[in-house]
Amino acid sequence: MMDEILLECEERMTSSVEFAREDLTTIRTGRANPAMFNSVIAEYYGVPTPITQMATISVPEARMMLIKPYEQSQIQVIENAIRNSDLGVNPTNDGQVLRVTIPQLTEERRREMVRQAKSKGEDAKIAIRNIRRHGMEQLAKIQKDGDAGEDEVRASENELEKITSNYVKQVDELVERKEEELMEV
């Protein structure tokens, strides 16, 4: 019973770290990275669709991306979605493909992005701690119901603390790597 609680908590913490990893890829650095478009949504025949499913995105140069829609009729829709996103990039449309040049980040913009990364990391750590709290409550309930002894519950609580510390450390490392990537000129 207690092992199941620990396993469930660990699975949920893993998904929180994965979500944080995905979330951090949406913060753009000074380099072209197709993952930055993962969160850009465009209307595709009335259905909100990620533009990554509407076009191929390639990186011919370090700070340039080419976006080639699967359907030429959607080029304007994709262009507007990118322009209206919070990425701070401006695509140029040549009728066939969209060219997106990634501007050099200013020092101020870099610091803003670092703050954003830290905020996303903090959100992930809060989610992990909430999972820990939920697990601790379940363990306390097991002890209260008399299904397990105090020593067993305490050992499981200690194990849950170790698991939590491990996942919080993983999030810290993700944020640290993103920060280094952002501050690189």
Curated annotation (Swiss-Prot):
Domain of life of the organism encoding this protein: Bacteria
Compartment(s): Cytoplasm
InterPro entries given in the database record: Ribosome_recyc_fac (IPR002661), Ribosome_recyc_fac_dom (IPR023584), RRF_sf (IPR036191)
One GO-annotated biological process of the protein: translational termination
GO molecular function terms listed in the Swiss-Prot or TrEMBL record: ribosomal large subunit binding
Keywords on record: Cytoplasm, Protein biosynthesis
GO cellular component: cytoplasm
Cross-referenced Pfam families: RRF (PF01765)
NCBIfam families tied to this protein: frr
Protein's job: Responsible for the release of ribosomes from messenger RNA at the termination of protein biosynthesis. May increase the efficiency of translation by recycling ribosomes from one round of translation to another.
Family: Belongs to the RRF family.
Protein name: Ribosome-recycling factor
Organism listed in the record: Corynebacterium urealyticum (strain ATCC 43042 / DSM 7109)
Taxonomic lineage from the root: Bacteria, Bacillati, Actinomycetota, Actinomycetes, Mycobacteriales
Gene name per UniProt: frr
